[in-house]
Amino acid sequence: MSNYKEIAWQGLWKNNPGLVQLLGLCPLLAVTATLTNALGLGLATVAVLIGSNVLVSLVREFVPKEIRIPVFVMIIAALVTVVQLVINAYAYGLYLSLGIFLPLIVTNCVIIGRAEAFASRNSVGAAAFDGLMMGTGFTAVLAVLGAVREILGQGTLFDGADQLLGDWAASLRIELWHVDNSFLLAMLPPGAFIAMGLLIAGKNVIDKRLEAKKPTPEAAPAITRARITKVG
């Protein structure tokens, strides 16, 4: 159980793919203009991460080390194709919004990195849980970044939620304030870089405060040595 707790802690916070490893920055910065797009890409990434970790863990004993990377990439590409077809069939609006970044999940270093560093060395259960935690941590960063950019840029939240969840989700849209013109800096890549930097800085501040609260180990008492100068 403690091993699974460590996997969760690593994926959600300590070794978060977005805030610590800084992997997958291209889609992370390009697709997070709205919370809906961020959640859509995040959920797709979670599905591929779990599936690829499970399959890699299952075939790890049968794949020669010399060709393991091409095999892992083929597994990931097959799963991304399945996810892409599912989104195309059931969430076509989201499929159009994500565009090229959906098939580019194949090249996401988070996925191939976990397949190589963890799934190929651990059991199926641990690999699946690692994929879930790493994917959830990555999705959380996407969601926070998407929410911040959407609020600052458009004054809304969950705009276009019907593209992800269906027609009923159109009622989830929240207009926090009315803006005649969008705040372009928040919607464009420079704003995404600034927001990402602030998120990383915030995490570092929290980590330092948590580290400062840890009790410092007490120093061992010094050993005093008595010097004998006279015998008898």
Swiss-Prot record:
The chain crosses the membrane at residues 18-38, 39-59, 69-89, 93-113, 128-148, 182-202. Pfam families: Rnf-Nqr. It is found in: Cell inner membrane. GO terms for cellular component: plasma membrane. It comes from the Bacteria. It is a multi-pass membrane protein. Keywords: Cell inner membrane, Cell membrane, Electron transport, Membrane, Translocase, Transmembrane, Transmembrane helix, Transport. Its main location: membrane. GO terms for biological process: electron transport chain. Its EC number is 7.-.-.-. The complex is composed of six subunits: RnfA, RnfB, RnfC, RnfD, RnfE and RnfG. HAMAP family: RsxE_RnfE. Belongs to the NqrDE/RnfAE family. This is Ion-translocating oxidoreductase complex subunit E. It comes from Shewanella amazonensis (strain ATCC BAA-1098 / SB2B).
